[in-house]
UniProtKB/Swiss-Prot annotation:
EC number: 6.1.1.1
Binding site for L-tyrosine: Y34, Y168, Q172
Motif 'KMSKS' region: chain residues: 230-234
Biological classification of the source: Bacteria, Bacillati, Bacillota, Bacilli, Bacillales
GO biological process: tyrosyl-tRNA aminoacylation
NCBIfam families: tyrS
GO molecular function: ATP binding; RNA binding; tyrosine-tRNA ligase activity
Source organism per UniProt: Bacillus cereus (strain ATCC 10987 / NRS 248)
Pfam families to which the protein is assigned, alphabetical: SYY_C-terminal (PF22421), tRNA-synt_1b (PF00579)
Catalysed transformations (reactions): tRNA(Tyr) + L-tyrosine + ATP = L-tyrosyl-tRNA(Tyr) + AMP + diphosphate + H(+)
Name recorded for this polypeptide: Tyrosine--tRNA ligase 2
Gene Ontology CC terms, in alphabetical order: cytosol
Function: Catalyzes the attachment of tyrosine to tRNA(Tyr) in a two-step reaction: tyrosine is first activated by ATP to form Tyr-AMP and then transferred to the acceptor end of tRNA(Tyr).
Subcellular location: Cytoplasm
Family the UniProt entry places it in: Belongs to the class-I aminoacyl-tRNA synthetase family. TyrS type 1 subfamily.
Length: 419
């Protein structure tokens, strides 16, 4: 199947401006296409992956993706999908975020070979345009009536929208025009909330370059979970691509915990597995859901794609250790990843009796309860049961002098940091 057929099978297309024309174009030649992201933060989250996975699919099909980092538009703020004004950021913060997002993109895309990916920053061609040029060369081509009718603006008319954010769609249209004339970009991809911005770009190109210009727009559906909530959030908030914000273990766990009703959809959206392999996994979901094979494959594919093979192996190792309760083989760094969200306590490195120590930390409510739990075999330290109420806790019991893990019962873990 060609790239458009594949995207349709994966359920990845929401709207497109000219399906027949785009299908014909990609069959005739390898095209350049672009997708942009504004540096509103110093990391992308998994919601950002959706359009960029599509870009990656085009790359694998031999087409030429152009990734735009919005160093200019990021200083303005996209009103799409928002009920209020964005807080303007300083140029220094924006540049820091540009650098961080650029580094993340370089991990996701192959920047060499026959289907080379280009990275551009719209600040490079926008910052020298003065206000007179902006109004004469670009503003003249936009009707206030049509701009007000765009959903991104119309939804904000009651609550208010600044002139700054109102003109955002012009800046994005200028980007498409620039990339069309300088990089031969003929297709823009974006989320479902970008339809108005994308069509503004198409209109501008045709006004400036002629109606025969072959340019297209394509948006991706808003991805909702089976319970109707928006995809991309965990109990702890957004799931980030930055391993300092969301560890590879947490990232892996997010995908492993996917609902049976969603996992096949996610395999289509996010992985590069073949239709045959996904169909096999879909059968497993129906016939052997308890094995969660589809979820494990999804988690493996995504963790490897974003964080690499080594981080995947580490995430699997931590998962297996937590499941079995055998955590002795873990390193201190793996302990830090795996127990990040567990109840955490602080202790000195001073040697103490286990009963006194558990009560002082607040893990046990009383000495009597601590002794009872130890005598009943309910307390484990670093994966080994504590059987003697006279046991001393020393720094030698810790992982690399940093952590001690206490398990009370079968599942109640606590992380004790020494310092």
């Amino acid at each position: 199947m060609n790239i458009i057929d594949e995207l349709e099978w994966r359920g990845a297309i929401n709207q497109q401006t000219d399906e027949e024309g785009l299908r014909k174009l990609v069959e005739e030649k390898k095209i350049s296409l672009y997708c942009g992201v504004d540096p509103t933060g110093d990391s992308m989250h998994i919601g950002h992956l959706i359009p960029f996975m599509m870009m990656k699919r085009f790359q694998l099909a031999g087409h030429h993706p152009v990734i735009l980092i919005g160093g200019a538009t990021g200083t303005i703020g996209d009103p799409s999908g928002r009920q209020s004004e964005r807080q303007l950021q300083t140029l220094e913060v924006v540049q820091h975020n540009v650098d961080a997002l650029t580094a993340q993109m370089k991990k996701l895309f192959d920047f060499g070979g026959n289907s080379e990916v280009k990275m551009v920053n719209n600040y490079d061609w926008t910052h020298e345009i003065n206000i007179i040029e902006f109004l004469r060369d670009y503003g003249k081509n936009f009707s206030i009536n049509s701009m007000l009718a765009k959903d991104i603006v119309a939804s904000r008319l009651d609550t208010g929208i600044s002139f700054t954010e109102f003109t955002y769609q012009i800046l994005q249209a200028m980007d498409f025009h620039h990339l069309y004339t300088k990089e031969d970009v003929q297709l823009q991809i974006g989320g479902s909330d970008q339809w108005g911005n994308i069509t503004s770009g198409l209109d501008l190109i045709r006004k400036l370059e002629g109606h025969e210009a072959k340019v297209f727009g394509l948006t991706i559906p808003l991805l909702l979970k089976s319970d109707g909530t928006k995809f991309g959030k965990s109990a702890g908030g957004a799931v980030w691509l930055d391993p300092e914000k969301t560890t590879p273990f947490e990232f892996y766990q997010f995908w492993v915990n996917t609902d049976d009703r969603d996992v096949v959809k996610y395999l289509k959206y996010f992985t590069f597995l073949t239709k045959e392999r996904i169909d096999e996994l879909a059968v497993k979901v129906e016939t052997e859901p308890h094995k969660r094979e589809a979820q494990k494959v999804l988690a493996e594919e995504m963790t490897k794609f974003v964080h690499g093979e080594e981080a995947l192996l580490q995430a699997v190792k931590i998962t297996e250790a937590l499941f079995s309760g055998d955590i002795k083989s873990l390193t201190a760094d793996e302990i830090e990843q795996g127990f990040k969200e567990m109840p955490t306590f602080q202790s000195s490195k001073e040697t103490k009796n286990i009963v006194e120590w558990l009560v002082d930390l607040g893990i046990e409510p009383s000495r009597r309860q601590a002794r009872e739990d130890i005598n009943n075999g309910a307390i484990s330290m670093n994966g080994e049961k504590v059987t003697d109420v006279g046991t001393d806790v020393t720094v030698e019991n810790s992982f690399d002098g940093r952590f001690i893990i206490i398990r009370k019962g079968k599942k109640n873990y606590s992380l004790v940091k020494l310092g």
